[in-house]
From Swiss-Prot:
GO terms for biological process: regulation of translation in response to stress. Residues 1-48, 426-470 are annotated as: Disordered. Belongs to the intermediate filament family. Transmembrane segments: none annotated. There are two types of cytoskeletal and microfibrillar keratin: I (acidic; 40-55 kDa) and II (neutral to basic; 56-70 kDa). It comes from Oncorhynchus mykiss. The gene is krt13. Type 1 keratin. May maintain oral mucosal cell homeostasis and tissue organization in response to mechanical stress. Expressed in epidermis. This is Keratin, type I cytoskeletal 13.
Length: 492
């Protein structure tokens, strides 16, 4: 947004036969500044002279350091003569200046436009056309610069305009490789989980088989103890059989000795006649007793042999079955050990493969992260270049708007000057001074111009009269266009 305020003062005085000068100054600043213009005319005659100063406002860029000067005027009458001068300067993106001067003589308050002044106006118009031509050239250069910036942005700096088609195939290939590696990694993880489950299953089976083996070994130990007990019982029975055999032999020996004794006793013939009951036959009784003992001994021997044979067969069967179970358990344990060793070897190979794949995955992720970082840095640098170009474009746009604003204000001031000059050429009756104050902004702006016209007419040298006319011009400007104008006139 730019704000400019200008003031213009105009004063004139005329006499009968003197000379007068008139000058005009105009200044403008770029950006936010305040400029001032001054227009004055002086004339003097034989009897007196006139001079007028009007208030003006000066300020620098930004609207700071404002100094306001007061205005005063005076008039006098006398003989005639006059001169006219005009000057203007402009600052900002471009500027121009012109001046004119002339002299003449006459008696009266009217101002005549001479041929000199027409030439000066022609020069002024030529300079204005030159200034407008420069403005057009600046606009064309600005448009060309904007076109070059736009082309540069479209060709170089815009990320969307860069041709990344050469990288699409590489990116797609890398993405396919990443997906394949991810699938392979997932399959490996699944295989590892399956191997862990199988290892847990085999560990459970191993523990069950180990418990069964321990129970079988405990049974075998119990059977061994039972076998030892049976062996000891067998040896005891054999010892008892041997004892019984020895006792039987001893009994047989005693029986034979008794038989021999009885026989020796029976060999002597004793004839004793007694009246007694008939005696039993001792040999028959002894034979019966012998048969009875022999039958009992044979029966006991048969029973012992049968019991021993039965127990021996039972123990042999149990030992054979236990030995078979033990051999089966040993073969199963050896098979389980071989399976466990194979699974442990496979687990170690899978773990080593997992470690190598994890290292490969980490290296791949690191490499792609580095590439992504480089691409991100490139994108960041391109974004910074884009931001700087946008800021340059905005700055140039603001400068262009400022130049357009200055051009508009200068055209308005030139139009106002032309209107004043046309008003003077149409024959104003008195010298006039006019002050125009304008204020503008980017939106709605209004301008109020106050004109003070003072004239002094020369009557006979003995009498001098002064007439003051005040003209207040109010203009409403929207976006550099005059919307409404109103004038108020006062005469004092």
């Amino acid at each position: 947004m730019s704000f400019s305020r200008s003031s213009m003062s105009y004063s004139s005085s005329g006499g009968g036969g003197g000379g007068g000068t008139m000058s005009m100054r105009s200044g403008g600043g770029g950006g936010m500044g305040m400029g001032s213009s001054r227009f004055s005319s002086m004339g003097g005659g034989g009897g007196g002279g006139g001079a007028m100063r009007s208030g003006s406002v000066y300020g620098g860029a930004g609207g700071s350091g404002v100094r306001i000067s007061s205005s005063s005027f005076g008039s006098g009458g006398g003989g005639g003569g006059g001169g006219y001068g005009f000057g203007m300067g402009g600052g900002g993106g471009g500027g121009g200046g012109f001046g004119m001067g002339g002299g003449g003589g006459g008696g009266g308050a009217d101002m005549n436009v001479s041929a000199n002044e027409k030439a000066t106006m022609q020069n002024l118009n030529d300079r204005l056309s030159t200034y407008l031509e420069k403005v057009r050239k600046l606009e064309a250069a600005n448009a060309e610069l904007e076109l070059k910036i736009r082309q540069f942005m479209e060709s170089k700096t815009s990320p969307s305009s860069r041709d990344y088609s050469a990288f699409y195939a590489i990116i797609a290939d890398l993405q396919d490789k990443i997906q394949a590696a991810t699938r392979v990694n997932g399959g490996i993880y699944l295989s590892i989980d399956n191997a862990k489950l199988a290892a847990d299953d085999f560990r459970t089976k191993y523990e069950n088989e180990l418990a069964m083996r321990q129970s079988v070994e405990a049974d075998i130990a119990g059977l061994k103890r039972m076998l030892d007990e049976m062996t000891m019982a067998r040896s005891d029975l054999e010892m008892q059989i041997e004892g019984l055999k020895e006792e039987l032999i001893y009994l047989k020996k005693n029986h034979e000795e008794e038989l021999l004794a009885m026989r020796t006793q029976m060999t002597g013939q004793i004839n004793v006649e007694v009246d007694a009951a008939p005696q039993e036959d001792l040999s028959r009784v002894m034979a019966e007793i012998r048969e009875q003992y022999e039958s009992v001994s044979a029966k006991n021997q048969r029973d012992l042999e049968a019991w021993f044979q039965t127990k021996t067969e039972t123990l042999n069967k149990e030992v054979a079955s236990s030995t078979e179970v033990l051999q089966t358990s040993k073969s199963e344990i050896s098979e389980i050990r071989r399976t466990l060793q194979a699974l442990e070897i496979e687990l170690q190979s899978q773990q080593s493969m997992k470690g190598s794949l994890e290292n490969t995955l980490a290296e791949t992720e690191g490499r792609y992260s580095m590439q992504l970082g480089r691409l991100q840095n490139q994108v960041t640098s391109l974004e910074e270049q884009l931001v700087s170009l946008r800021s340059d474009m905005e700055r140039q746009g603001q400068e262009y708007k400022m130049l357009l604003d200055i051009k508009t204000r200068l055209e308005m001031e030139i139009a106002e000057y032309r209107r004043l000059l046309d008003g003077e050429a149409s024959g104003l009756g008195a010298s006039s001074s006019k002050s125009v104050q304008k204020s503008s902004s980017s939106g709605l702006s209004s301008s109020v111009s106050s004109s003070t016209v003072s004239s002094s007419s020369s009557v006979p040298s003995s009498t001098t009269s002064t007439t003051r006319k005040v003209v207040i011009v109010t203009e409403e400007i929207v976006d550099g266009k005059v919307v409404s104008t109103s004038e108020t006139k006062h005469t004092t």
